[in-house]
Amino acid sequence: MKVIITGTSSGIGKAIAMHYLQQGFSVIGIGRKHTIDHADYQPVVCDLTDEKAIRSLDAESWTSDDILLVNNAGMLGIVKRLSDQDSPDIGAVMALNAIAPALLMNKLARTCEAAAKSLTVVNISSGAAKRAIPSWSAYCASKAALEMLSETFYLEEQEKGRNTKVYCVAPGVVDTPMQAQIRSVDSTDFAASGTFHDYYEKGELASPQLVAQKLNRLLEMPYSGEVFYSLRSIE
């Protein structure tokens, strides 16, 4: 199996990449920045907000093995009430959090089918997909889109008789650069700021490494056809 992960420079993506590298798998990392130095890690420099750049990726060269695709790359965007934003970045947030995963799923589903290889997709979602959080309008919308995309893609693959596995997982509250960004926002713009400071100060943030371990345990379980999971519930 070959593992393809977006957004491996830090946080959850890097932890998942390192987990699989330590297990002896080849890992392809896709993103603008790369911080992993490993013989079995192949960095692919790509701006995942650029549709043309994604479409130009040579996926055919990756499908000599079965594929695990982890769509991890994501951004929170401007943390401010939508009506207070001078230059909303909704387009960029949707491009990275929802459109890039869709394009990669499309590309790899087609190439895996042509090469007679299996495809497993893991889309990293968030509790914000199901709960409106003021000042996170673009992020909430993009993760909701990702969840519907995941379920629809799974049903489409079932219609085609493909054995594609699709998971859309919420990792919980994790100690990542995104959490640091959240804590940097004043409560004037983000009313729930204090809650996230409390998570950090009370040591309630999960480590990215724990998330990687829980994801691995989930993927080792027999596949039930269930798409949505909270990694908090995985022991």
Regions found by a protein language model. Name each.
Residues S9-G11, A17:
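N-terminal Rossmann NAD(P)H-binding glycine-rich loop of SDR-like oxidoreductase domains
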Residues H38-E51:
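Rossmann-fold cofactor-recognition segment
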Residues G74-G91, R110, S135:
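Conserved mid-core segment of classical short-chain dehydrogenase/reductases
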Residues Q85, A132-C140, T152:
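Active-site loop-to-helix junction immediately N-terminal to the catalytic Tyr of the SDR YXXXK motif
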Residues M105, S142:
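Active-site helix of classical SDR
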Residues S126:
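Residue(s) in the substrate-gating loop at a strand-loop-helix junction
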Residues C168, T176, D186-E235:
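C-terminal helical subdomain
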